[in-house]
Amino acid sequence: MFCALCCGLLAQSARRTVCAMLVGARLSQTWSHHRAHRFFSHAKWSVDGLSAVLARLVVRTLVPIGDAVLVAIDDTLFARRGPKVFAASWFHDGSAPGEKKVGYGNNWVIAAIVVKLSFLDRPIALPVAFFLVRKGPDELSRLAAARRLVTMLSEALDGRRIDVVADAAYAGKVLRGLPASITWTTRLRSNAALYGLAPAPTGRRGRPRERGGRLASLSELAKQATFAPATVSRYSKTTAVEVAVIRCLWYGVFGRQEVLVVLVRDKAKTGYDIALVTTDLDVGPGGVVQRYAARWSIEVSIEDAKQTGGVGEARNRVQLAVERTVPFALIVNTLTVVWYATVGYHPHDVDERRELAPWYRDKAQPSVLDMFTKLRRVIVASYLRPVDPQPPTPQEITLLRLAWEDVEA
């Protein structure tokens, strides 16, 4: 059932509802649509278990041996309607039109493994773990959910080094006591209270101090800091910036754990443009800047998933179905990229795309849409290879023609 619906979602170029997956798999006249819906609402399978297997697959095939696994964290809203949709509520939605950036739907925290592919000049984020946010006093916050996902990935990868990167919303006391194999990098809030390192024990009676004196504000620290030039690769470009490094404590978030604060300025001659903080004390300031810049890849991945992969288009309402359909579609998105990176890529893919769409004069790399389109063509072509070779029916010819028209579009 999983393989059938997976292929059906990929083969379906229209709206990717559960019934549409069945149609895309060419099983709509063989299986009842209830069978497809029950796969999400009643069948015994675990999203977390599937996430663990997927994470191991991504790391084994796309992350070099010995390298740390870079994990980006973010949350997004999938719009829904109706009071009976499980866990649907009003949440912040940065993509919402107008001044009030709120929307109604299901809010998901997503953990994605960021990888570099030889045919792309930018990192790409592959979603592997997911958490549905529920409102309520006893429910996990987004930050607590993020830590839970990272801990789950660490266990699935047998304690392999994980470098987490997230925006400023993902910083709080819940991050205290992170395992040694997990580092956390985020943007430092402008009003963050920083403290000096704990002084050496005095030998006197009483509990030793856990922190030094409070440091000045970030703007004052920037005036006093010594900036040094650094060359960083970010957003598909190599740029020169100036950085200053401060070793201190962000006691309100990480407690007694020592952190590295990196002040970055691009064009400003005074002050700073952005402040970053990391628990990774071994990385250089340029590495911190590049790591945080790689966080943008999860934003792109979520947008591709919504616009290209059909994620969030299933109209489920009951708890298990709501908890499974979005992760299922995101998993299919990740599997598509893994397939393309391992066996699907060909250097002529871009040339073929430019021949079909000559107005893309500067296109030099395959997009996620190109990856989906190629896999869709492979799946559709497989439908036309029966065990007992027979001439294709008019319906099969139409199906293949529509697949190629989707490429040209």
Where are these regions (language model features)?
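Electropositive nucleic-acid engagement tracts
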Residues: 9, 13-83, 89-90, 151-152, ...
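Extended, non-catalytic structural segments that build the interaction scaffolds
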Residues: 2-9, 270-296
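Short, conserved catalytic/metal-binding motifs centered on acidic residues
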Residues: 21, 36, 67-81, 111, ...
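Short amphipathic alpha-helical "interface-anchor" segments enriched in bulky aromatics
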Residues: 77, 285-316
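Electropositive, glycine- and tryptophan-enriched low-complexity nucleic-acid-binding patches
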Residues: 29-38, 94-160, 252-275, 279
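A short, flexible helix-boundary coil/loop motif
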Residues: 1, 9, 117-118, 122-135, ...
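Active-site-proximal, Lys/Arg-enriched surface segment
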Residues: 41-123, 130, 233, 239, ...
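Domain-level cores of phosphate- or acyl-group-handling catalytic modules
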Residues: 135-204
